[in-house]
Amino acid sequence: MNIKLINIGFGNIVSANRIISIVSPESAPIKRIIQEARDRNMLIDATYGRRTRAVIIADSDHVILSAVQPETVAQRLTSKDDLEGEA
């Protein structure tokens, strides 16, 4: 089993195999998901005090906040897939 890791900013790395979705934090439903994760102690804040630009939802019900744009995280995710396919 290959473990693919994705850099989500500031040296923080998550397993690509565990990511369910990468979304913007602007909508009310996502804000509710963040608050519920905080209440359940399942929130991981990887923003280093910066503005949250991406919310990553993992298959373990963890919610990860990142200061990197969702498009950037998705691009890193797909570029890692492309590199693995060539090997």
UniProtKB/Swiss-Prot annotation:
Signal peptide: none annotated. It comes from the Bacteria. InterPro entries: RemA-like. Pfam families: RemA-like (PF04025). Disulfide bonds: none annotated. NCBIfam families: MtxBflmRegRemA (NF046064), PRK04323.1 (NF003315). Belongs to the RemA family. PANTHER family: REGULATORY PROTEIN SSL2874-RELATED, REGULATORY PROTEIN TM_1690-RELATED. This is Putative regulatory protein BH2513. It comes from Halalkalibacterium halodurans (strain ATCC BAA-125 / DSM 18197 / FERM 7344 / JCM 9153 / C-125). The lineage of its organism: Bacteria, Bacillati, Bacillota, Bacilli, Bacillales.
